[in-house]
Amino acid sequence: MLGGMADRPYHHGDLRAALIANAERALAERGPSALSLRELAREAGVSHAAPGRHFKDKQALLDALALTGFDRLTGRLEDALAAVGEDGARTSVLALARTYVGFAIDNAALLDLMYARKHDPRSSAQLSAAMERLLDTVVRPIVDGQSDGEIAGGDPWPVAMTVSAALHGFATLKAAAPPEKVEESLAEVVRVLFEGLAPR
């Protein structure tokens, strides 16, 4: 039976994507320590050796999953900015905040994996680039706010890092809070941030 499984073509069309999707579900349900390439292969209906064509080991799969998370989050942040349009830096940052915190609450295990220290050095460059793309999205309304006088001038990158850190910490603290409380508190956090960032 195993021989037939190994010889038949993959019915998914994209085994790599199927493995990542199954891994994300398993991560959310059981955590990273419970992930098994053999079990994921069984769920995908392929031989236990088949995942090795895409991921040399479990860590490579986890790194790919983290990269997928960064790409998805960045895409959602970009969509949030596009939906706001030219409505001011504070409105843009609040839209980013809602999107980031919503993603963090819905994908807590994935977000933990994305920012985990333990990654294969060969994946670190890709993950660093993915994190930089995310920060590029956050820095955009900061630069606009500086141009419009809402935010003090200077290097926008430390400001973007501060905003990102505040949102990440907020999401961690409020993960189990009722949605209406999260929204109320989030608006207050953004208000306080902009008071601190305003020109003196």
Positions of PLM-derived features:
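Helix-turn-helix
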Residues: 18, 22, 26-60, 64
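Hydrophobic alpha-helical connector segments
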Residues: 64, 78-110, 159-163
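C-terminal alpha-helix
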Residues: 141, 192-200
